Curated annotation (Swiss-Prot):
Keyword field contains DNA-binding: no
Full protein name: Aspartate/glutamate leucyltransferase
E.C. code: 2.3.2.29
Gene (UniProt): bpt
Keywords, comma-separated and alphabetical: Acyltransferase, Cytoplasm, Transferase
Superkingdom of source: Bacteria
Organism in which the protein naturally occurs: Cupriavidus taiwanensis (strain DSM 17343 / BCRC 17206 / CCUG 44338 / CIP 107171 / LMG 19424 / R1)
Function: Functions in the N-end rule pathway of protein degradation where it conjugates Leu from its aminoacyl-tRNA to the N-termini of proteins containing an N-terminal aspartate or glutamate.
Biological classification of the source: Bacteria, Pseudomonadati, Pseudomonadota, Betaproteobacteria, Burkholderiales
Catalytic reaction list: N-terminal L-glutamyl-[protein] + L-leucyl-tRNA(Leu) = N-terminal L-leucyl-L-glutamyl-[protein] + tRNA(Leu) + H(+); N-terminal L-aspartyl-[protein] + L-leucyl-tRNA(Leu) = N-terminal L-leucyl-L-aspartyl-[protein] + tRNA(Leu) + H(+)
Length: 265
């Protein structure tokens, strides 16, 4: 890579936030390492940061930087080697009729309404069910990298044609896709929208000829994050190197075995 292309990454500064309450593990405090300034984090730089374990929330690019905890483990699916298990095949068959539309990050009132409904039923009391439109847009619709919004609706000719079922945000990297966030209709019983969304993203990553789908952080002791271990083969970032999930050891693999609630990106 030329020096000109390396310049934005070398010009970045990193700082640690003050401790705050962890949103994944009760009773723990968390810190983040934040990459700045945001205007230097273009698609190329962001791809490299993701490979180093960073994520983004809006234009805020960060990775866990906790004092006494290393539970958040970056993970990615090797899409060329992925084979769905039986429950994943059922989820695909149940929802493959949905019509997907890929679009730029754009505010749609219907999306915002579904987001609030999803938060109120899946994460009641967490505060995000009270997000204003500005907070929603800052969280999901602001990006300085190559980002897309995907909406899933019931197809024409179906009993509820056009009904919005799910919305997903993804980033396009130079070596894969990164799943940013997903919310869906929480009212339909027996749906597997979260699982279907990841399967759809795996297929899209493969169709683009890219090797990895980044799923954010796997956390063994968090039921809403441990589901990611169900998508194999999975790699995890430890010690600045990507390793097979199985290399974490038997205890870590067993911790992810129980089937948790539907996924959160």
């Amino acid at each position: 890579m030329s020096k000109l292309k390396e310049l934005p990454l070398s010009a970045l500064q990193f700082y640690a936030t003050a401790p705050y309450a962890c949103s994944y593990l009760d009773g723990r405090m968390a810190r983040s390492q934040v990459a700045t300034p945001a205007h230097l984090i273009n698609a190329d730089v962001y791809s490299r940061l993701v490979r180093a374990g960073f994520r983004r929330s809006g234009i805020f690019t960060y990775r866990p930087y906790c004092d006494d905890c290393h539970a958040c483990t970056p993970c990615r699916v090797l899409v060329d080697q992925f084979t769905p298990d039986r429950s994943q095949r059922r989820a695909w068959n149940r929802h493959q009729h949905l019509q997907a539309l890929v679009a730029p990050l754009t505010y749609v009132e219907e999306h915002y309404s579904l987001y609030l409904l999803y938060q109120s039923m899946r994460h009641a009391g967490g505060g995000m069910d009270q997000d204003s439109r500005d907070q929603y847009e800052q969280f999901l619709l602001q990006s300085r990298v190559n980002s897309r919004l995907v909406e899933f609706r019931d197809p024409p000719g179906s009993p509820e044609a056009g009904r919005l079922r799910m919305v997903s945000m993804i980033d396009v990297l130079d070596d894969g896709l990164s799943s940013v966030y997903t919310f869906y209709d929480p009212l339909e019983r027996n749906a597997s929208y979260g699982t279907y969304n990841i399967l759809w993203q795996i297929r899209q990553t493969h169709a683009l000829g890219l090797p990895h789908l980044y799923l954010g952080y796997w956390i063994a002791d968090s039921r809403k994050m441990a589901y990611k271990a169900r998508f194999r083969p999975l790699q995890v970032l430890t010690g600045n190197h990507w390793h097979a999930f199985e290399d974490l050891g038997t205890e870590a693999a067993e911790a992810a075995a129980p089937v948790p609630p539907a996924p959160q990106a």
